[in-house]
Amino acid sequence: MSDSDLRACLCVRGDGVLLMLSVVPNARRTEADGLHDGALRVRLAAPPIDGRANDALVAWLAKSLGVPKRDVDVLRGESSRRKQVAIAVSHDAAAAWLGGLLGGAR
């Protein structure tokens, strides 16, 4: 993952980070699937009905990053595949997590 890839989907915001996401609901399982148009693509097993996909996304991000769910907030795109999520975690920790996810991604 290049620095420009990292800058495109992850930036510092106050005491945390902003993460740009491209979400694909109704997948077989919840997992990261590389970068897509400057955002981390996440496949979600949940359907996009009654906020279930957003709830699954928040739970997956919180568990993956080791933060409470209350520290993950969907700021933009609640009803869209493109989302902007604020996470109360250090930029270094988020960048290391993202690098680990994308290490083998194309």
Regions found by a protein language model. Give the residues of each.
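Contiguous, often N-terminal, cationic amphipathic patches that form binding interfaces
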Residues: 1-59, 63-69, 73-79, 84-106
